[in-house]
Amino acid sequence: MRLIPRLLNFFYRHLYHGLAFTYDSVAAVVSFGHWTEWINETLPFIQGTRLLELGHGSGHLQRVLLDSSSSVNARSGLFVVGLDESSQMGRLAQRRIVRAGIASPRLTRGLAQALPFHADTFDSIVASFPAEYIVDPRTLSEANRVLRGGGRLIVMPAAWPKSRLLQWLYRVTGESPTEVVEIVKEKWSQHFIRAGFEVSVETLEVKSSVLLIVLARKLTEK
């Protein structure tokens, strides 16, 4: 029963490192071409001007955040940082952002479980389709530490295209997105609460897809 998780971990490890150059292609296939659209749906939930992206990957959201025409970038004093454990992803993101005409992106290599930032630094932290590290108590403790009081951790753990093929597969396999939503609500929420967050789990329907969003607000000290 543990074989599948091990295979998935092996796949993800290589996808983020030695096979990082295939990441965008794989993401496009598994999302039916909606990958960047899904990631951009986190933008309306971002608050404040000091932003951290955990697991910036190949830099799609970083590019949008730093685009001078974006609604987020219009905020005065915007400060955006991206963090990823993979040096290969760092190089891909750097190239993407520089090609977009942004001279000096703030990208750093590191672990979410040991963030290299001072306490109370960020207004928002965002993570799109993160691996299991996101519910590691060390990750959530670090996110709570570097967020300002009332700051927001935004996590998009899953999304589904509105596809007839997928609906058929759900019927055949007996599985459905509803099960994932319930797991996140019942199990993930407890991790966030124990780390000092007030948490809500929302499903967001857009034109082509259904997205799962976790919104965790850092509780302010009384």
Predicted regions and their residues:
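Conserved class I S-adenosyl-L-methionine
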Residues: 2-46, 60-64, 168-174
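Class I SAM-dependent methyltransferase SAM/SAH-binding core
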Residues: 52-114
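A short acidic, Gly/Pro-enriched loop at the edge of an enzyme's catalytic core
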Residues: 113-124
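A short SAM/SAH-binding and catalytic strip from SAM-dependent methyltransferases
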Residues: 124-135
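A short glycine-rich, Lys/Arg-flanked "PGG" loop and its adjoining helix->strand segment in the class I
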Residues: 138-149
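Conserved beta-strand signature within the Rossmann-like core of class I S-adenosyl-L-methionine
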Residues: 151-158
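Short alpha-helix
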Residues: 180-196
